[in-house]
């Protein structure tokens, strides 16, 4: 293999009077290396930074206020008290990342036609960007969180780990409208629920919010549902929902998930459903992260609903590109992520997502020299903290 990648005609030349006969011409080659690879670190650039992790498994606590209830006291009354408040713990793991390479001593010394002249500096910059992509991939794609186990490295749960469907199986008694969950539901009278089912009970709507009233006999697993908050709090019979059939595979959806089950593309109604779920819980999402393909769909949905009434003639054409929409629950902006697939959209409140560094990215120093080449390694470790996933929503299993 040739040491020099430029093959020159060493002559003798026919003459040096004309370019077609002369030799010794210099190359016109730019010193700048053009790289069209896109920037893919969407979340790494936008998520906040929490306090550094001090353990390979880190945890945090969440809570929410109890629903409102009727609170009217006599002028003269005795004080009563009860247990109050509930906390929920969440956790994630630190994932370690590294990239390495090597370059020969000769390759570092030979003159280059591009910058930087030292090949190590060029390659270090390259692998640093590549590792940033690997980190972004973990945030974007990791569906599990796990500790290191033998030869299996630890993985940090990414956005899909936090934004996934979580359900409790339940059964419906049609006579009294009592719903029984398969495990303790940890809800209070006045909380709202969403249902999913293979066969939806007659009189129940998927994606509709219902307010619950705990059953006196077994409040940990039984409740009734109502159309209004007041109906649930005050037990108004006229507001109770009593489906006429039990349906099949009925579950309560605990997270803000709109599941299209691969049957259809998403619509503006689906975005509004997700936003409504978050709104009811107190979140304030501002961006919807999606693939470029689904961003085109977003633009078409918005422009299709736009009315042009400026007396446009039939032979005139108006092209619009929409990136944001004002909904009943606030302004939402569509953002494309180069790593996103077509099957999901994440509607995020960016105030509740943080990167927790355990080991910030650095070059490993002091590596022993093994031969006529130089090895280099960069490494780092972090975990993702989805502080409050209920402040965000996701549309899943979108049909392409």
Predicted region positions:
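Small/polar beta-strand repeat architecture
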Residues: 167-261, 300
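Internal mixed-charge
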Residues: 88-108, 117-137, 279-305, 323, ...
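Acidic Ser/Thr/Pro-rich low-complexity disordered segments
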Residues: 71-87, 228-244, 312-317
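A structural detector for beta-sheet-dominated domains
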Residues: 61, 104, 173, 180-182, ...
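Assembly/oligomerization interface modules of large self-assembling protein complexes
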Residues: 24-104, 124-125, 147-148, 152-154
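Glycine-centered loop/turn motifs
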Residues: 68-80, 190, 207, 342-345
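Sequence/fold signature of self-assembling virion shell proteins
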Residues: 2-38, 152-169, 253-269, 273-276, ...
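Alpha-helical scaffold segments that mediate packing/assembly in large oligomeric complexes
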Residues: 109-178, 205, 245-273
